[in-house]
Structure formats: structure tokens, C-alpha cells
Amino acid sequence: MSGLILDSGAVSYFADASADYARAVMAVFGSEDLWPPRVPSVVLVECLTGHPQKDARTHMFLKGCDVTTILTESAARRAARLRTLAGRGSAVDAALVALAEPRGLIITSDKQDLTALAANAMGVTIEVI
């Protein structure tokens, strides 16, 4: 998948950020040809509540993202391997890192697990929002 990928913390952060700040960040990533970001559908499990009113801002933000619904068997196997090598991290985090290969950028609010998973990945960079 590579490119710019957002985890649940980053989705929630951008959804709650001020409109001016969000537009500024989008402009920066857009100038680097990294916008719109990709959001694997499994991330929605962590950033949505199932309550329409509580999720309204997140749904609005996600309309501007490329929500990816495919986790192939090979990506799932790669995620399992990365998780085993790291000895930590959730299945969702491992899937994000596997999908970011090669040379992808993941924006997160929780750097520890993703950094451990990315240590064995091909050129995946983790940045904290």
C-alpha cells in the first residue's frame, strides 16, 4: 500500500482538529503528493463508537480519505510475521505496518508499538501527530 497511512489515533486527532489546522496539514501532505491519506478499514474498529452523533466528525473526516477495505492473505501473513518479530503490538497495528510496506509513512498518536513493528519492515516510517 505505501504512501501516507493513518492509524485510529491520527484519524481521531484530525477529525477533532480545528478546520484551519486540518487544512494546513492537508496542504503540506498534498504538496508532497501524500494526500488523501489511506485508512485501512480495520482502523474504523478503533476510531468509531457506533453512535452516529459521536462519530459525526470522524465520518466527515473519513470522506476525504481513501478507506481501503482489502487486507489480502499475504498482507495478513506479513502482519503476523512482523508482530511475532516485534513481540508486541495489536493485530491492527501490525496490519498497518504490513500495508505501509514498502517505504510508507504512518501517522499515529502511539509511537511505541508501531515503531517496534516497523523495525522489521521495509522502509516504513512512523511519525507522531
Language model segments and positions:
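Short, well-structured N-terminal submotif of metal-dependent ribonuclease cores
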Residues: M1-R38, L48-D66, E127
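Alpha-helix/helix-capping structural signal
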Residues: G9-A10, V42, Q112
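Conserved beta-strand termini and adjacent loop/short-helix elements that scaffold enzyme active sites
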Residues: P40-V42, I70-E73, E127-I129
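Non-catalytic, well-ordered alpha-helical scaffold segments
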Residues: S41-V45, A94-V97
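Amphipathic alpha-helical segments within well-ordered protein domains
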Residues: L44-L48, A80
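Active-site neighborhoods of divalent-metal-dependent phosphate/nucleic-acid chemistry enzymes
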Residues: T68-Q112, A118
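Short, basic/aromatic-enriched C-terminal tail that caps enzymatic domains
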Residues: A116-I129
